[in-house]
Amino acid sequence: EKIKFEEKDLLKDNFDKKFDIIVTKDTFEHSLNLPNILNKFYDLLNDGGKAYIGFGPLYNSYNGDHGRTQLRLPWLHVILSEKIIIKRYNKKNSNKINRIEDLGLSKYSFKDYKKMFSESKFDIDYFITNQSDHPIGKAFNILSKINFLEEYFTFNIYCILRKIKI
């Protein structure tokens, strides 16, 4: 059978087929309605189907703003208030924003993601963080094991979610 690509809105469009596998890479940190997306994934998968998910950087990590706030220092987007960031951004740009989410960032924390995954209908078959070949990744992985630093030194998530067979 040939592969066919279609552009569809996951939450608005209807799908006439179910899937065995869903793959998503570097999108969840931009997705504003993740619980609904996870529910839709669940509905679209066949029993036993899997969602392979990888994404980052997470918002509270050193570059979690993806540079979109135009702040030059690591974690400054977490340190400064949203009000200050928006005011500074709007002063420098013709396309004005009212909230950080207008820059295409969900602002979900690592804690938020863990909660959304655990509260979803899925079984979590695999869950790992801070996957990188970069030397700083190893240091961040160590620092993320310290409880109060976990949120700020966890920069990506890779997981496999499985739809339970009924």
Short names for language-model regions:
Residues 1-64, 158-163:
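Conserved SAM-binding loop
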Residues 35-36, 40, 50-162:
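S-adenosyl-L-methionine-dependent methyltransferase catalytic module, highlighting the catalytic core
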Residues 166:
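Flexible, glycine-/basic-rich loop-and-beta segments that form/coincide
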